[in-house]
């Protein structure tokens, strides 16, 4: 059974300095929009940079253009920080907005806001996603929210784009799954448009040994994405727009057949945030829950690393015999650190943790203001701060709430 956030202590609860990749960590600092209290959008979307002891060393405002707060706030290669929502915003360390683009920049668009992920692909180009409202009778009799990926210049020119509804057959859905999508639109709340794919990730492939060995599916610059409602991750070939690789989708009957066999870990349920590592493997946040057509149920979250050529799972982390204590069914993120550890979070609880290859938790932080979408560990040299002593004493695990807990613990952005 999951514990309530109120059952957890707050702040840093585990820290083994010699086994961590010591640095700074981004955490969301405020709760949801509250017009009754008069909390401003800037206050809603405040992000904190904390040290390994949980002390706030710097603060940012995320995306003041949206009352919901940014789903994403990350450091990019040039040292700036990007966020999304009603607009894409890039800011410097001091919070100066150096570039911004509203999601209504397309004259023919019905603005929905930039959702989930954004990637800065060069000094002047960005990958972003919106959800276009379309009628696609070849896919569904229900009006759909169709994921639309765009590469946009800093001048607001679209130089490349991709739509999900052009590629139905490439996702590998079974006939039964396609019939469910046709009848229901898939994935939506009652009375809403069909959220048939629900993409949540944009990741351009880095240089990797798979492409060096001649496998053109993994060409650097191709786009790795993730369909939460379709239970799969996939690669888009940049030059053609075709889906050239996917992994994780199985029909419900196939997963039942695999139950209790060695292949039972070869499928995904509601995944988020896949990333190709420099060894060519792919790291995934596999949420669990109940998604798919028809839904597949798995009530624990796991982190998995796969070999994309063989499909083999080469590393997996879940919470052992009490796996359901690590369950985040709607959001999540994962980051492989330079020392081989993995940073992730139990988003529903606001719990961030660093885990070794062997499955040992060597750092843990409980956000006193509850859940948020993603986190990021940033190296000391990448922040204009004097680095702390990298080997402070271990902190004991408190037996009480060490920090005040706000009344916004149920905050969680759209999955």
Say what each PLM segment does.
Residues 1-415:
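Histidine-/acidic-rich catalytic cores in large beta-rich domains
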């Amino acid at each position: 059974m999951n514990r309530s956030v109120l059952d957890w202590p707050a702040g840093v609860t585990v820290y083994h300095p010699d086994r961590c990749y010591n640095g700074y960590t981004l955490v969301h600092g405020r709760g949801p929009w509250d017009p009754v209290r008069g909390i401003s959008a800037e206050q809603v979307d405040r992000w904190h940079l904390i040290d390994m002891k949980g002390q706030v060393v710097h603060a940012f405002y995320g995306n003041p253009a949206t009352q919901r707060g940014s789903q994403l706030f990350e450091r990019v290669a040039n040292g700036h920080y990007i966020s999304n929502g009603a607009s894409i915003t890039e800011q410097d360390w001091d919070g100066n907005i150096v570039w911004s683009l509203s999601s209504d920049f397309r004259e023919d668009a019905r603005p929905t806001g930039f959702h989930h992920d954004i990637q800065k692909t060069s000094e002047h180009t960005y990958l972003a996603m919106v959800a276009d409202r379309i009628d696609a009778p070849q896919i569904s009799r229900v009006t759909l929210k169709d994921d639309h990926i765009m590469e946009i210049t800093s001048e607001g020119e679209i130089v490349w784009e991709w739509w999900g509804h052009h590629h139905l057959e490439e996702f590998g859905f079974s006939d039964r799954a396609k019939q469910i999508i046709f009848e229901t639109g898939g994935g939506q709340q009652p009375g809403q448009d069909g959220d048939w794919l629900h993409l949540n990730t944009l990741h351009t492939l880095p240089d990797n040994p798979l492409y060096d060995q001649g496998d053109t599916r993994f060409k650097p610059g191709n786009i790795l994405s993730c369909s939460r409602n379709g239970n799969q991750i996939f690669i888009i070939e940049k030059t053609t727009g075709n889906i050239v690789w996917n992994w994780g989708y199985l029909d419900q009957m196939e997963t039942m057949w695999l139950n209790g066999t060695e292949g039972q870990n070869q499928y995904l349920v509601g995944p988020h945030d896949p990333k190709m590592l420099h060894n060519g493997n792919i790291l995934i946040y596999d949420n669990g829950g109940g998604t798919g057509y028809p839904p597949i149920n798995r009530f624990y979250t796991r982190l998995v690393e796969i070999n994309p050529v063989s499909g083999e799972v080469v590393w997996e982390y879940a919470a052992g015999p009490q796996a359901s204590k690590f369950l985040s069914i709607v959001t999540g993120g994962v980051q492989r650190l330079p020392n081989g550890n993995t940073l992730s979070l139990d988003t529903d609880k606001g719990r961030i943790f660093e885990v070794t290859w062997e499955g040992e938790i060597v750092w843990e932080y409980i956000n006193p203001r509850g859940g948020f979408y993603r986190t990021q560990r940033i190296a000391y040299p990448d922040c204009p701060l004097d680095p702390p002593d990298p080997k402070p004493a271990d902190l004991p695990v408190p037996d009480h709430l060490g920090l005040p807990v706000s009344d916004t613990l149920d905050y969680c952005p759209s999955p």
